[in-house]
Amino acid sequence: MQVNELGFLASLLFVLVPSVFLIVLYIQTASREAK
């Protein structure tokens, strides 16, 4: 099965972007509660 590079990149972004967003949101909340 040949992997479509653009499709692979799109799915990678589709997974990474929400994950990074959630991690940043969690860190902001944690640092806010720590103060």
Swiss-Prot record:
Q: Indicate yes or no for the key word RNA-binding.
A: no
Mainly resides where? membrane
Recorded GO cellular component terms are:
photosystem II; plasma membrane-derived thylakoid membrane
| UniProt membrane topology term | Single-pass membrane protein
Per UniProt, subcellular location reads as:
Cellular thylakoid membrane
Q: Which GO terms describe its biological process?
A: photosynthesis, light reaction
Signal peptide extent:
none
Name the Pfam families on file.
PsbM (PF05151)
Q: What S-S linkages are listed for this chain?
A: none
On assembly, the entry states: PSII is composed of 1 copy each of membrane proteins PsbA, PsbB, PsbC, PsbD, PsbE, PsbF, PsbH, PsbI, PsbJ, PsbK, PsbL, PsbM, PsbT, PsbX, PsbY, PsbZ, Psb30/Ycf12, peripheral proteins PsbO, CyanoQ (PsbQ), PsbU, PsbV and a large number of cofactors. It forms dimeric complexes.
Query: What does the sequence similarity comment in the record state about its family?
Result: Belongs to the PsbM family.
Q: What the protein does? A: One of the components of the core complex of photosystem II (PSII). PSII is a light-driven water:plastoquinone oxidoreductase that uses light energy to abstract electrons from H(2)O, generating O(2) and a proton gradient subsequently used for ATP formation. It consists of a core antenna complex that captures photons, and an electron transfer chain that converts photonic excitation into a charge separation. This subunit is found at the monomer-monomer interface.
> What is this protein's record name?
Photosystem II reaction center protein M
- Its encoding gene is what? psbM
